[in-house]
Amino acid sequence: MKQILYKLFEHQYLERDEARTILQNIAQGKYNDVQVASLITVFLMRNISVEELCGFRDALLEMRVPVDLSEFAPIDIVGTGGDGKNTFNISTAACFTVAGAGIPVVKHGNYGATSVSGASNVMEQHGVKFTSDVDQMRRSMEQCNIAYLHAPLFNPALKAVAPIRKGLAVRTFFNMLGPLVNPVLPTYQLLGVYNLPLLRLYTYTYQESKTKFAVVHNLDGYDEISLTNEFKVATCGNEKIYTPEGLGFARYQDTDLDGGQTPEDAAKIFDNIMNNTATEAQKNVVVINAAFAIQVVRPEKTIEECIALAKESLESGRALATLKKFIELNNK
């Protein structure tokens, strides 16, 4: 590790194979916490390259516990986190909204590292038991249209660095990696990122994959569509900037999206959304993220049609029914 750190401290970049080997060694416990923290710090001080990101991703995918749910052609809706905004669990609520609209979802999530509550915190608050049992996940897909994968059960490297990430309490390149390494290798993904360089980095990375995708970034720094400002959506062949008003929504304040101070607070907001008793801002932010996810799967539909489908899922109670069935099946 010493030679690698010297190389990085001299402002050099890693080759793809070097990055791959480093992450494999981290997962195998070959470096101590100080060395790993030093490595992480380098990537807090400069942007990661495409080669480095792909190498780290290669290692995680090679070491993952594979899960074959390809027959469902599912979508994952996921953000990098690390935007410092402490929003409520927008992507998790969007996942159940999309599942309620009839589209299979496989959510890959974790505990919050830089926020009060990650997707796994919300699931735990509802009594969900995490599992790596593929048969159980397949039943969940068949009966609920959604399955949940708790990242540490499938990515040993993520588990190995979890205490270091929590101790640093700032975004790291592992925030960038999480959305890229869903063990299912879903057919579709809606990915949220916290800055424009990462939007382009993700777009380059996904263009060499078979995944049908969209990458979103709110221009005021959110790693999801927040309706607080203009936002950019990038797909394989297109980039477009949208405004909230252009899609029929109001423009909201940061405080409208606050996730609270505890996982219990975040779970309460999540429940209000599913019960269709949330604030207008909370509901509409979930709707717009769900709508762009639906459009990834159904590109023949206009975004206005996808917004209508997402709203209907929440307002009809189908999203809530999906959640209730999911909790019942997965709390045993």
What positions do the PLM features span?
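Acidic, glycine/proline-rich low-complexity segments that act as flexible tails and inter-domain linkers
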Residues: 1-87, 101, 105, 252-257, ...
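Glycine-rich anion-binding loops and their surrounding alpha/beta cores
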Residues: 7, 59, 65, 87, ...
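Short amphipathic alpha-helical face segments that pack within enzyme cores
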Residues: 38, 93-97, 285, 289-292
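A glycine-rich phosphate/pyrophosphate-binding beta-strand-loop-alpha-helix module
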Residues: 40, 88-144
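Acidic, glycine-rich active-site loops and adjacent beta-strand->loop/helix elements
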Residues: 79-84, 109-115, 154, 219-220
